[in-house]
Amino acid sequence: PKDRVALQIITEAEKDELLVPHTGSWIFEGTVGSTGISLATLACAKGYRCCIVVPDDVAEEKATLLRRLGAVVEAVRPRGIVDPRHFVNEARTRAQSWKPNRHEPCARAFFADQFETDANFSAHYEHTGPEIWTQTQGHVDAFVAGTGTGGTLSGVSSYLKEVSPSVLPVAADPPGSGVYNRIQYGLMYNATEAEGTRRRHQVDTVVEGIGLNRLTRNLELGLPFIDAAERVTDDEAVRMSRWLSTHDGLFL
């Protein structure tokens, strides 16, 4: 799914002339790795350079893969999204402050902005959702997804609800995330946000990049179509990953 999102973001930027291939232009993004890997892959294929800003506790395997794909990887301390030094805000700042050199006067800098761009939602509404519906021959009772940016859950849920109102879209929410309460009760909040209990890692889970404590544009677009949410513990997630590996051959 991240390949779809990355391609949609880059394609729309090219249509809007925010990016021009083979001009020395740079793509900047703040990510825990997955979207960055897709952006770095496509940057190589389409003639761009790529700078990915990650939290410094991201899995080393992701950072290594990003570097091998040619991306410049910058690691920053994990901070809250309101902090200008949060990895997403750092990526935006780097894009805004970047200047072309005299040898590449047509080069540009583009901030992918995966959390807020409509291209994320559109990729899943226009592609992932229809692919699921087609490949299952319309036999979909429920769709369950976590929320990183909210794009997958929102885009797919919107499409499936459109073709079959009886489909049940469900958010799977990890410890520390506020999505469960937002969907069930209309309030984006988790008990770990109470005064005196806040932590360095607000979404406290072994599942990197999943969970939100703010309403992103991509999650907001899908809220009318998401029917329910379920809390999933780390133990449940790890046990299911082992089950899928053993029984379905899926390495997650």
PLM regions: where:
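Generic beta-sheet signal
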Residues: V53, V76, Q114, G146, ...
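Active-site/ligand-binding loops adjacent to catalytic centers
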Residues: V88-K99, R108, E162-L252
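A short, small-residue-rich loop immediately preceding and capping a beta-strand
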Residues: L19-D56, H139-T152, L250-L252
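Positively charged, low-complexity intrinsically disordered leader regions
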Residues: P1-G24
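Active-site/ligand-binding-proximal alpha/beta "capping" segment
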Residues: E104-G148, G155-V156, N218-A228, D235-L250
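Active-site-proximal loop->helix
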Residues: W26, T35-S97, V179-T192, T216-N218
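Buried hydrophobic packing segments
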Residues: A6-A13, L39, A91, V156, ...
